[in-house]
């Protein structure tokens, strides 16, 4: 909660302390509901015949048409999302629809919870790589014209690339742009 309050103070200094507190509480509640409740329900509710009841899809949007075109071309692509919307649903639905996907993830600190969420993530075929030491595996996937997904809004630590974000510098992964440049491949950003 302290981290959320500190981040909100930097990002939204115009809000009062009480407004920031309320926003932090609502945000944490939403994250919990999204992660725990929706992740439990997703494999049961979102199926090849019911997914359109749970996912809004705008195939006529020009950017989405371009992204789908890249995915259908069977060429290597880097996909990025953040901790916004329902990132778990995004990977689940993409693999359920037949897109071959591998995603990088940080293991959860709780081993039981980590095993459970891996089962949910892999239920429809999403392959999960532990983000630490995955460089060679990611390069092999891209060499084979595969797709790799990143949740790009995580702290990359002291070795990351520092970029301006809500009035201060934040560390993000250098690997995403470096891989895109090395392989001359597109980076597709989106959310669910």
Go through the PLM ranges and name each one.
Residues 18-19, 104, 131, 190:
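Residue-level detector of family-conserved "landmark" positions at structurally sensitive sites
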Residues 1-81, 114-119, 123-125:
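Membrane-anchoring hydrophobic helices of lipid-metabolizing enzymes
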Residues 43, 75-132, 155-170:
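Catalytic core of membrane glycerolipid acyltransferases/transacylases, capturing the structured
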Residues 99, 133-192:
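Membrane-associated lipid acylation/remodeling enzymes share a hydrophobic transmembrane-juxtamembrane segment
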Residues 60-64, 113, 131-135, 172-173:
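Amphipathic coiled-coil/heptad-repeat helices and related helical stalk/stem segments
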Residues 71, 95, 122, 142, ...:
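Anion (oxyanion) recognition and catalysis
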Residues 64-68, 91, 117-118, 138-139, ...:
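Short amphipathic alpha-helical segments and helix-helix/interface helices
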């Amino acid at each position: 909660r302290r981290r959320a309050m500190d981040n909100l103070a930097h990002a939204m200094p115009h809000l009062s302390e009480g407004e920031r507190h309320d926003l932090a509480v609502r945000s944490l509640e939403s994250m919990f509901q999204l992660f725990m409740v929706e992740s439990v329900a997703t494999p049961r509710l979102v199926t090849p015949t019911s997914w359109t009841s749970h996912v809004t899809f705008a195939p006529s949007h020009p950017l989405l048409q371009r992204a789908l075109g890249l995915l259908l071309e069977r060429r290597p692509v880097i996909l990025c999302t953040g901790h916004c919307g329902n990132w778990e649903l995004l990977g689940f639905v993409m693999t359920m629809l037949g897109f071959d996907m591998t995603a990088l993830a940080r293991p959860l600190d709780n081993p039981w919870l980590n095993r459970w969420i891996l089962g949910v993530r892999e239920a429809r075929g999403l392959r999960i790589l532990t983000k630490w030491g995955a460089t060679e595996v990611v390069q092999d996937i891209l060499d084979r014209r595969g797709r790799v997904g990143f949740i790009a809004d995580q702290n990359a630590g002291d070795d990351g690339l520092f970029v301006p974000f809500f009035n201060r510098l934040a560390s993000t992964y250098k690997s995403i742009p470096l891989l895109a440049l090395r392989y001359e491949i597109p980076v597709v950003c989106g959310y669910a």
